[in-house]
Amino acid sequence: MTSPATLVLIPARMAATRLPGKPLLDIAGLPMVVQVLRRAQAAEIGRVAVATDAPEIAAAVTAHGGEVVMTRADHPSGSDRIFEALQTLDPDRKIETVINLQGDFPTIRPEQIGAVLEPLADPAVDIATLAAEIHTEEEATNPNVVKVIGSPLAADRLRALYFTRATAPWGDGPRYHHIGLYGYRRAALERFVALPPSPLELREKLEQLRALEAGMRIDVGIVDTVPRGVDTPADLETARRVLGG
């Protein structure tokens, strides 16, 4: 059910080295960023907007009926970009929850977007995110696959203790592939962007470690599959096959 207190923001930039102009690449007849926008709208959890510094992206989104907020080009991270967008779109501070949905997840399912809200039902949780169980050794050992190590709270919920590119945790038992979709309480996002980059964040190159090092609580919803991000030409062709039927 759509909530006026929830805002889904999709940060999108043109500066992709491996796939130039990535947000505007065609997938099944629509620009990639519009495919993501459509999935966010179908989730029906709140207002949806694309945050970008690129006029070309803004034009494509508005041409397909989407909402756009223009942001500065010099943001160090997507979190800083969505914070600027939040301030622009909601100066009266009516929004309580902000979803940060990456613009290169064209195959994400609407119900997965909605699932990131569930951990925030606990008022002790500052930030929510998602993960799926790892089933192959290749995935477990790939440094481009971020693993979340957490303490189980329920069959489908972890409290995050650490995120790493290493193969972890050691020993028998499940390992989890982190999915880069975040739900922030507004106060948590405000606190997060005010913090300096942390030592472990810089070492692992994982922004979410800044929150953990500052003592913020991140809970993780467990879902059944990892939506395919699009970072390479091969990823793009896979997304085109999936969405092209």
Swiss-Prot record:
Keywords: Cytoplasm, Lipopolysaccharide biosynthesis, Nucleotidyltransferase, Transferase
Species assigned in the record: Rhodopseudomonas palustris (strain ATCC BAA-98 / CGA009)
GO biological process assignments: CMP-keto-3-deoxy-D-manno-octulosonic acid biosynthetic process; lipopolysaccharide biosynthetic process
Intracellular or extracellular location(s): Cytoplasm
A GO-annotated cellular component: cytosol
Function: Activates KDO (a required 8-carbon sugar) for incorporation into bacterial lipopolysaccharide in Gram-negative bacteria.
Reactions the enzyme catalyzes: 3-deoxy-alpha-D-manno-oct-2-ulosonate + CTP = CMP-3-deoxy-beta-D-manno-octulosonate + diphosphate
Name of this chain's protein: 3-deoxy-manno-octulosonate cytidylyltransferase
UniProt-listed CDD domains: CMP-KDO-Synthetase
Location (main, coarse): cytoplasm
Entry EC number(s): 2.7.7.38
Gene: kdsB
Pathway stated in the Swiss-Prot or TrEMBL entry: Nucleotide-sugar biosynthesis; CMP-3-deoxy-D-manno-octulosonate biosynthesis; CMP-3-deoxy-D-manno-octulosonate from 3-deoxy-D-manno-octulosonate and CTP: step 1/1; Bacterial outer membrane biogenesis; lipopolysaccharide biosynthesis
Similarity-based family: Belongs to the KdsB family.
Top-level EC class as recorded in UniProt: transferase
MF terms in GO: 3-deoxy-manno-octulosonate cytidylyltransferase activity
Keyword field contains Transferase: yes
